[in-house]
Curated annotation (Swiss-Prot):
Some glutamate residues are glycylated by TTLL8. This modification occurs exclusively on glutamate residues and results in a glycine chain on the gamma-carboxyl group. Residues 24-42, 144-170, 188-216, 240-272 have a biased composition (Acidic residues). Nucleolin is the major nucleolar protein of growing eukaryotic cells. It is found associated with intranucleolar chromatin and pre-ribosomal particles. It induces chromatin decondensation by binding to histone H1. It is thought to play a role in pre-rRNA transcription and ribosome assembly. May play a role in the process of transcriptional elongation. Binds RNA oligonucleotides with 5'-UUAGGG-3' repeats more tightly than the telomeric single-stranded DNA 5'-TTAGGG-3' repeats. It comes from Mesocricetus auratus. Keywords: Acetylation, Cytoplasm, DNA-binding, Isopeptide bond, Methylation, Nucleus, Phosphoprotein, Repeat, RNA-binding, Ubl conjugation. PANTHER family: OS02G0815200 PROTEIN, RRM DOMAIN-CONTAINING PROTEIN. Sequence repeats lie at residues 57-64, 74-81, 82-89, 90-97, 98-103, 104-111, 119-126, 127-134. Residues 308-384, 394-467, 486-560, 572-647 form the RRM domain. Residues 650-703 have a biased composition (Gly residues). There is a cross-link at K298, K325, K371, K378, K513, K577, K589, K624 (Glycyl lysine isopeptide (Lys-Gly) (interchain with G-Cter in SUMO2)). The modification Omega-N-methylarginine is found at R695. The modification N6-acetyllysine is found at residues 9, 15-16, 95, 101, 108, 115, 123, 319, 349, 378, 399, 428, 445, 468, 477, 513, 521, 572, 577, 646. This is Nucleolin. Identified in a IGF2BP1-dependent mRNP granule complex containing untranslated mRNAs. Component of the SWAP complex that consists of NPM1, NCL/nucleolin, PARP1 and SWAP70. Component of a complex which is at least composed of HTATSF1/Tat-SF1, the P-TEFb complex components CDK9 and CCNT1, RNA polymerase II, SUPT5H, and NCL/nucleolin. Interacts with AICDA. Interacts with APTX. Interacts with C1QBP. Interacts with ERBB4. Interacts (via C-terminus) with FMR1 isoform 6 (via N-terminus). Interacts with GZF1; this interaction is important for nucleolar localization of GZF1. Interacts with NSUN2.
Length: 714
């Protein structure tokens, strides 16, 4: 109670001393009085700062603290400032740092209270020193609070000292804005008591330290002003410093972000030149498109520079066209083979090499083990590089050859031949061969010069192939043929007889064919072709009814067509016989280049193939070219026979539209239909017509195609 009274008295005197001017130093007596006042009120000196940190001190304490601190309690550890203003500002800041943390441990109260420097006055309803609180009023408020604090001071002093020592090393946590918020929150009386006791003990320690140093002499007015302006300002400065630090950090972060953004923009700007402008890009894209197209045209659309072409496979597609051309030419150049041009496919996996001569081409084909960029290349003659029409125009058909003839022997006769292909069956030569030349002119020249030449004891017969040969057949003219038939049809032939057997009998025959069934057995008849009508007529007269292998044969002239298979006028449809039972319509169609569809005649009851069918083309020219190419060819291992299909209306058995029982020509169905016997068609029971009805259905009359006629043998 005595201390509180003294404190109140001191504050009253402080009020009276406010008017005098600022004084830096006073008499020694005044210093002693100030020290005595510090003794009486020293306990409250640190209270406001403790309160500021704890937000639990009363306003009176806070006012006294700031005054006493400013007047007589300079910070012992810190340097005393010369000017009172600086001292006042410095002292509370330093004091605020240490006690603020000291209270945090024992009290363990809310963080908001500990952080607020100006929070205390709000609790008691008193105005804070920053707002110009009067010392007299604060002293009165202090009396009511101090009564409860005196009893507990001594008991808690030891604990508080330990707490203070521990807490002095902890950094202060000061937030100006948080202090304002904490000022609004009320604190309990128990908290005030504990904190007051701690502050009193701290004040005593500060008094001892202040005696050793020189006391600052400040007038009461100065002391009064100090709490109002200095303490909150200092608190504000600390908070502002923290805010400034935060703002600086934020500014630094923003600066870093801006720098990153600038770097990204710079990178984008650097990348932008790489991306072409829309117009430029469009041009480049056009160029990119044009290059492959030009390359493609060069490879696929270009004609070979020479007729001596070589196919090369298994190239390295990872290399460029230029690299491949150089690498492909090198191995041939090392072998003294002149390469005219090298063409590669668009995928660069294959290519073609054009040579100057057929000799170079043949030598190139003999080379083995050639490697290009590590890949062993495949060498062979190109397949289908030239159209069959072009190849047929420069190809001759050689007949009446010895069955023992070889390609080398023919090569000696036809020296300028580009390719020679012997026709064989079951590994045995059939006595015919196809001889291809460089050009159509060379083929014509050889036909004139080598016609009838003797090869291995036999006179060879040469014929044109392709369209030129078809025209000659229609006109009945060929190099050695007359308008008369040069083919004999031989019937009642022994099933064991072979073409070799017949060749021994008919020595002048240029072509002999013995048709076989699906099992490879003879059908009992044959076609024998001669070089001239006179030879055919002579054979007919001398060999008719001759016995061959136990059977008497019958001979007759086939007709003026000059070919065993040319028994009717050309059309858009080919008749194919001798098919295997396993042959499908798809296989049949694929066997004839240029065909549009194919159909195989099957048995109505069993559904099995009858061994023949029809192949349609878009034009007669396509049909002729296909017929010539497949002459004496094989399908699924069976040798097939080709003929022109009969035009509509000429066949019996209802043509394609009628069923087998109709006999009604074109329109008859199975029930007889319109025609009766013969109907509208020319033939009666003859003709090869469609036995099954075909596309026209059972009712007949559909969009049927013409068929060939049936050859009848006695």
């Amino acid at each position: 109670m005595v201390k509180l009274a003294k404190a109140g008295k001191t504050h009253g005197e402080a009020k009276k001393m406010a008017p005098p001017p600022k004084e830096v130093e006073e008499d020694s007596e005044d210093e002693e009085m100030s020290e005595e006042e510090d003794d009486s009120s020293g306990e409250e000196v640190v209270i406001p700062q403790k309160k500021g940190k704890k937000a639990t001190a009363t306003p009176a304490k806070k006012v006294v603290v700031s005054q006493t601190k400013k007047v007589a309690v300079p910070t012992p550890a810190k340097k005393a400032a010369v000017t009172p203003g600086k001292k006042a500002a410095a002292t509370p800041a330093k004091k605020a740092v240490t006690p603020a943390k000291a209270v945090a441990t024992p009290g363990k109260k809310g963080a908001t209270q500990a952080k607020a420097l100006v929070a205390t006055p709000g609790k008691k309803g008193a105005v804070t020193p920053a707002k110009g609180a009067k010392n007299g009023k604060n002293a009165k408020k202090e009396d009511s609070d101090e009564d409860e604090d005196d009893d507990d001071d001594e008991d808690d002093s030891d604990e508080d000292e330990e707490d203070e020592e521990e807490d002095e090393f902890e950094p202060p946590v000061v937030k100006g804005k948080q202090g304002k918020v904490a000022a609004a929150a009320p604190a309990s009386e128990d908290e005030d008591e504990e904190e007051d006791e701690e502050e009193e003990e701290e004040d005593e320690e500060e008094e001892d330290d202040s005696e050793e140093e020189e006391a600052m002499e400040i007038t009461p007015a100065k002391g009064k002003k100090a709490p109002a302006k200095v303490v909150p300002v200092k608190a504000k400065n600390v908070a502002e410093e923290d805010d400034d630090d935060e703002e600086e950090d934020e500014d630094e972060e923003e600066d870093e972000e801006e720098e990153e953004d600038e770097e990204e923009e710079e990178e984008e700007e650097e990348e932008e030149p790489v991306k072409p402008a829309p117009g430029k890009r469009k041009k480049e894209m056009t160029k990119q498109k044009e290059v492959p197209e030009a390359k493609k045209q060069k490879v696929e659309g270009s004609e070979s520079t020479t007729p001596f072409n070589l196919f090369i496979g298994n190239l390295n597609p990872n290399k460029s066209v230029a690299e491949l051309k150089v690498a492909i030419s090198e191995p041939f150049a090392k072998n003294d083979l002149a390469v005219v041009d090298v063409r590669t496919g668009t995928n660069r996996k294959f290519g073609y090499v054009d040579f100057e001569s057929a000799e170079d081409l043949e030598k190139a084909l003999e080379l083995t083990g050639l490697k290009v960029f590590g890949n062993e290349i495949k060498l062979e003659k190109p397949k289908g590089r030239d159209s069959k029409k072009v190849r047929a125009a420069r190809t001759l058909l050689a007949k009446n050859l010895s069955f023992n003839i070889t390609e080398d022997e023919l090569k000696e006769v036809f020296e300028d031949a580009l390719e020679i292909r012997l026709v064989s069956q079951d590994g045995k030569s059939k006595g015919i061969a196809y001889i291809e030349f460089k050009s159509e002119a060379d083929a014509e020249k050889n036909l004139e010069e080598k016609q009838g030449a003797e090869i291995d004891g036999r006179s060879v017969s040469l014929y044109y192939t392709g369209e030129k040969g078809q025209r000659q057949e229609r006109t009945g003219k060929n190099s050695t043929w007359s308008g008369e038939s040069k083919t004999l049809v031989l019937s009642n032939l022994s099933y064991s007889a072979t073409e070799e057997t017949l060749q021994e009998v008919f020595e002048k025959a240029t072509f002999i064919k013995v048709p076989q069934n699906q099992q490879g057995k003879s059908k009992g008849y044959a076609f024998i072709e001669f070089a001239s009508f006179e030879d055919a007529k002579e054979a007919l007269n001398s060999c008719n009814k001759m016995e061959i292998e136990g059977r008497t044969i019958r001979l007759e002239l086939q007709g003026p067509r000059g070919s065993p298979n040319a028994r009717s006028q050309p059309s858009k449809t080919l008749f194919v016989k001798g098919l295997s039972e396993d042959t499908t319509e798809e296989t049949l169609k694929e066997s004839f280049e240029g065909s549009v569809r194919a159909r195989i005649v099957t048995d109505r009851e069993t559904g099995s193939s009858k061994g023949f069918g029809f192949v349609d083309f878009n034009s007669e020219e396509d049909a002729k070219a296909a017929k010539e190419a497949m002459e004496d060819g094989e399908i699924d291992g069976n040798k097939v026979t080709l003929d022109w299909a009969k035009p509509k209306g000429e066949g019996g058995f209802g043509g394609r539209g009628g069923g087998r029982g109709g006999f009604g020509g074109r329109g008859g169905g199975r029930g007889g239909g319109r025609g009766g016997f013969g109907g509208r068609g020319r033939g009666g029971f003859g003709g090869r017509g469609g036995f099954r009805g075909g596309r026209g259905g059972g009712g007949g009359g559909g969009d049927f195609k013409p068929q060939g006629k049936k050859t009848k043998f006695e």
